[in-house]
Amino acid sequence: MRRLVPLAFCATLATPTLLHAQGAPTPLDRRVDSVFAAFDRTSTPGCAVGVDRNGTPLVRRAYGMADLEARTPWTMGTISESGSTAKQFVAAALVLLALDGTLSLDDDVARWVPEVRGIGKRITIRQTLSHTSGLPDRYTLHDVEGRPAGEVDHPNAEVMAIVAKLRDLNFDPGEDYLYSNTGYVVAVAVLERASGKSLQSFTQERIFGPLGMTDTRWREDHRVVVPGRAPAYSGTAATGFRNDHPFTRVHGSGGLLLTIDDFLKWSGAMQRGEGRWGAVRDSLSAVIRLNEGTAITYGLGVTTDTWRGVRRVSHTGSTGGYRAALYRFPDQQVSVALLCNVGSANPGGLATGVATVVLGDALEPVRAEIAPMLAVPPEALAALAGRYHSARTEEVLVLEVRNGHLVDSLGGAVLVPWGGDRFRVRGGTAEFAVTRSATTAQVRVTAPGARATEYTRVEAPVITDAALAAYAGAYRSPELGAPMTFVVRDGALLIDQGWRGTVRLQPLYRDGFRMPGGEILRFTRDARGRITGFVAWAGRVRHLRFDRLTAGAAPR
């Protein structure tokens, strides 16, 4: 049961905690402390951060409370959870197996995991590690099955059982990039079957042990007592904190328990690249290209990009209330590692703040975005307003004119004129290019390291009770066996979730609806125009098919 920490208790503890087992701060320490000022309290969960340069510790700081109930502060010995920063360890383990000659990263996954054969498409190990496999993400699949993460304890075997039922992918392998935790659970299965050892045994023998990572282990079972582990929390000091422990046995996509020092031992091995670690490092950061040639920034378990003029290899992580980040700057030989035990912590923002302090003059100055001084006539902006639909991702743009600017009302982005029929997202790098014909308009959205997405203008639907009644009824996913029921009430289409209540759908275009969380449902019809089912696009899951079982009742 999650428990609320009373505010009165928190108020009695509102004092800084940096004096806990930490030496006199250096000037660099004080600048790093400013990044974590919000966590420097005995009333809040906290963080630990470490920075190394050329293998030499520069910073070791801890803030806030590791355990609010036991009133235990964070220290450098506190064990926390990695979130998705764990993925690089699974990728490294498979690279080691490839170096051994046991397998190839370009092997068909089905060689080791026959559960994927029902999909009928060749997926390589490399594609599972680079999120280009097309495998739908497990979190959404659990939700659809009515067994959501956080409420149900899932083991890796359950994820593999779902994979065995899949008959389609988000896209053909290699055609696109879409983050998938499922891919890493499949990768763990490949590793364990190819090596004959558990993930824990293999990584202990080949990675943790050799690198002296004595406080590192996989969270194979969340029920196991781990001395020195910080519990995880959600909430804020204003609302109170609740326990937010990962209630799951899934590991490999996340679920690595470790300390800051162990994190940095791993990063140091990647920096030095001695022996086989050089080949591992280079494999993780090698450029991945989609089938049509686009280079993506994600490699195998890490992202490699350029930030303010310096090369950066990084990953962040979040599971439950745990947050983590590991940033490595190869040319400066600097590593930044952080672990936090509260969901409000922004690991990427914190790691970037620390890197800004540590790298200093090595960074290019932050230049203010200077948009071209272009004025677009109001009538020209009004002509672009409307709804645009991507057949590839099923995403929808709703462009509106607000205060003289073109705005994506669903995504919240403000579009700045950039010359011709081009616009750029204010404060971002995505570019919108508009093309028009006599009958329609299209928007092409591009961003660095991503495949372009084309959207075509669609008309807003005409909504009547009779039109909505055509969608009402019961549906089921043939892959997951999950039911879904639609009803019409008060002039709206709703998903009836029984005791969980109802979800109101927003009409977007003919047969297309949006759920409050952004998920898109598109109903399908036969040659006679009758509703036969629908397909769902939900973030990291695309075109999940549901077949119609029964028609619904009349509106009420």
What are these model-predicted stretches?
Residues 63, 67, 120-330:
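Short, surface-exposed loop or secondary-structure junction motifs
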Residues 6-17:
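Bacterial N-terminal signal peptides
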Residues 352-556:
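Peripheral terminal and inter-domain segments
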Residues 38-48, 69-127, 169-182, 251-254, ...:
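Short active-site loop at a secondary-structure junction
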Residues 19-23:
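Boundary at the C-terminal end of the N-terminal hydrophobic targeting segment
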